[in-house]
A protein has these predicted regions:
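Charge-rich alpha-helical segments
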Residues: 1-92
Length: 92
């Protein structure tokens, strides 16, 4: 588990990810509602590290929320997943 101070330190390197209600949260704009390529890439990354985000899809927008529910806190797994998702997001 990471302290809030540690999480905020990591956030400085994570672009526009935010700490909201005990989760790391970020929304990504897509080119269209049917642009599922980004979500599929996120799913593959999540599966590869066995850590899965909450994914909310709205019209041309994908919101990702990360939290380690087994310990009810943000952990290094969330930071790793956010970092890898951020790399995908820069290619949108």
């Amino acid at each position: 588990m990471l302290s809030e101070k540690e999480v905020r330190r990591y956030l400085t390197d994570l672009g526009t990810w935010e700490l909201r209600d005990g989760k790391l949260v970020k929304s990504f704009q897509l080119s269209s509602f049917v642009d599922d390529e980004f979500v599929n890439k996120v799913a593959k990354v999540a599966e590869s590290i066995n850590h899965h985000p909450i994914i909310t899809i709205n019209w041309k927008k994908v919101k990702l929320s990360l939290k380690s529910f087994d310990v009810d806190a943000i952990t290094n797994r969330d930071i790793e997943l956010a970092t890898r998702i951020e790399e995908l997001g820069t290619k949108l």
